[in-house]
UniProtKB/Swiss-Prot annotation:
Membrane topology field: Multi-pass membrane protein
Location of the protein in the cell: Cell membrane
Lineage: Bacteria, Bacillati, Bacillota, Bacilli, Bacillales
TM ranges: 8-28, 54-74, 87-107, 117-137
Protein name per the record: UPF0756 membrane protein Bcer98_3279
Coiled coil, from the record: none
Main location: membrane
Source species, domain of life: Bacteria
Similarity section: Belongs to the UPF0756 family.
GO cellular component assignments: plasma membrane
Keyword entries, A-Z: Cell membrane, Membrane, Transmembrane, Transmembrane helix
Gene source species: Bacillus cytotoxicus (strain DSM 22905 / CIP 110041 / 391-98 / NVH 391-98)
């Protein structure tokens, strides 16, 4: 008999294939390999507890590569400060990081909310070709909205 988790992942794989979402397809295939081998017992719990931090680290490395390769240096930083688009990007980066901080708090304090956030991310990735940074940012947005609602109670 196929387990509920295997069936759920298989349905998501089909959605990923229909939507031609490579990230979702690869993620599910990796999870299947881990789940069906001896590696799953060790790696899946680690990924569940540390996966978001690991993902953020990988994204941070990717963002810093142009600095490491010398494509971006102090000259480009100075030139960027002359553009109002750069200032908008700077403010956006700060806002997103602060939202993510609140999201991390929410996911830590209310783990049951994770299910809704993960499902929302899956829908966005599979159907709208979104990027799976959603759970943390989504949790941050949810955290901010929840705090605003609390202010009016």
């Amino acid at each position: 008999m196929i387990s509920q988790s295997t069936l759920f992942l298989f349905i998501l794989l089909i959605i990923g294939l229909i939507a031609k979402n490579q990230s979702l397809i690869v993620a599910i295939c990796v999870l299947f390999v881990l789940k069906w081998t001896f590696l799953g017992d060790k790696i899946l719990p680690y990924l569940q507890t540390k996966g978001i931090n690991l993902g953020v680290t990988v994204i941070t490395i990717a963002v810093l590569v142009p600095i490491a390769t010398g494509e971006i240096g102090f000259k480009q930083l100075g030139e960027a400060t002359k553009s109002y688009y750069a200032w908008i990007a700077l403010a956006s980066g700060i806002a997103v990081a602060l939202l993510a901080k609140g999201g991390l708090q929410l996911l830590t304090n209310d783990p049951h909310i994770t299910t809704a956030l993960v499902f929302g991310t899956i829908i966005a990735v599979a159907l709208f070709n979104g990027v799976a940074v959603g759970p943390l940012i989504g949790a941050g947005i949810a955290y901010a909205v929840m705090n605003i609602i609390q202010m009016f109670k």
